[in-house]
Amino acid sequence: MARHEIGFRQACTCVLALWKLRVGVEAYYLAQVASGLDEYYTGGGEARGRWMGGGVAGLGLTGEVAPSDLRAVLAGLAPDTGLTPNGTTLSAHPRRVPGFDLTFSVPKSVSVLFGLGDRLVQHAVVEGCEAALAETLGWLEREACFVRRGTNKASNRQVWGERWGTRRMVANGFVAASFRHRTSRAGDPHLHWHVLVANLAQGIDGRWTALDGTAVYTAKRTAGVIFQTAMRRELTRRLGVDWGPIRQDSADIAGIPARVLREFSQRSTQIAEWLDNAGLSGPAATDAAILATRQRKQIAVDFAALETAWHARADALGWGPAELEQLLATTVAPAAEGYVIDEVTWHGGVRQVTSRMVGFDDWLTWLLDARVTAHDGAFTRFDLTQAIAATLPASTPIEVVEATVQRALASAAVIPIGDHWHDRGIVHASCRLIPDDRALRYTSRSLLAVEARLLAQLAAGIDVGVGVLDPESVEAAIAGSTLGADQAEAVRALTGAGDRVAVMVGRAGTGKTHTFGTLRTVYQAAGYSVIGLAPSARAARELADGSGIVSTTIARHLVDDARSTPPPSWWLMRPGWPASAIWLLSSIT
């Protein structure tokens, strides 16, 4: 059962999916549109698509999406002209990408609230989510709406000289059509929006060309976090709902029982069961499970009948209209928590670990250590934006998130690493070329301090006679093994160096785990305990299976270590403690 719960959580937390559109795919979205408002509520059609984005005005598009207009912009044409927006004939390109489908999904609890709520509740949910969607698309336009200028053709290199190569140019906004859908392929409430972004944008030089799609892909996860943050704020403001903890970028409405969420998550259950039966895990396996269990989506769906069935299923679980009404009646919107930009009133996520108010610098240090660099020593501006958006109170507007990011990057706690000018830059409205800091990587001052302490300890542990074995016993073990010449040399080096920490580096498949098996043999024969450590449970199992070493995860080791007095494994870094064990760390990079 626990494995199914994990699969359910993993399958439900993709808040923003991004796909390249195929030629002619717009027919799928247009076919699901209802003929009118009455059919939307009583029949099977979905809401009509609506134009979004700063680029639609340049094409004279507004309001509801007309099928002919959508077909035109996805083909790279201006509506009703048969020509490109530049007034030219479209050049045929066999691999042209019509656009991108940005699919924004809400947490299952929000879909359940929409599916079981009355018309007023449904309207409030849709209104709040669409406000968040518009805010997120605006953020994406500021951060990831670019066209390319220049050329990478080798034949033009001498002609163009220093101007050779492509550069990003700021565009005037996306040409996008938003379609709202209410159900999953399994017939459960699943509120989501398909935002079809045409591969067409106008640069600030006035010329219409294809988008720089790589920028959108880079910003995808951060945009998903921005959407979830804005959605929580909007639904709290409209309906007074409170939220549970944020896990994997998403949070559910507090008060809706887990059994109800599971009942209306048939797709997630199907995916989890497929993974369980296949014995697989990870993103690639999840993608395979999604495709393997995918049903053909019904276009003609009786939404009124579905609503009746949803209410019956919820009633059977003891969570009907009375419980929903009580949830909305007793949930009160919390007052805004302190996050004033120019004052020392920072609280945010720190309230989860302390009750005291803190200054911005202390708050930022906590955020960097606990949320940003806990699993990766370097981060980008987008990574920092995700952490700040997910940590500040639900009432925080996006402008405050962006201002907080800028203040954090200017803080002494954040250290840029690498070259500011490694990218060719972005052409802005002033026609000046400025650096693109989206790809710039940063680290934290506190992490550099930890690194400096670690390096000092490593230096102090060089050639101190720790773990040195009798060369004859080592040679005997090598002779009785199937090690190659380079593996045998690694065993000699590791058992004869005398350093507190010794490192063996090799590509995947070069036999590092097999070499560890021989190290286990010689060290155990010399009276040492040999224990393996790995960053994940899967890596620990592979280390144990391949080397015969009893292995665990680094996280589990740290928990167990903290309960020991003194922690026995710290002899590696504490010269005064006995060298009675050998700890082998596998796949740590």
Q: Where do the protein language model's features map onto the residues?
A:
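Generic hydrophobic alpha-helical segments
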Residues: 192, 490-494, 586
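Intrinsically disordered, flexible peripheral segments
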Residues: 1-375, 380-389, 403-406, 417-424
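Conserved ATPase-coupling elements of RecA-like P-loop NTPase cores
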Residues: 575-587
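Glycine-rich, phosphate-binding/catalytic loops in enzymes
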Residues: 549, 587-589
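Basic, gly/Ser/Thr/Pro-rich low-complexity segments located predominantly at protein N termini
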Residues: 29, 54, 211, 514-516, ...
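ASCE P-loop NTPase motor cores of helicases and related translocases
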Residues: 279-287, 291-383, 387-577
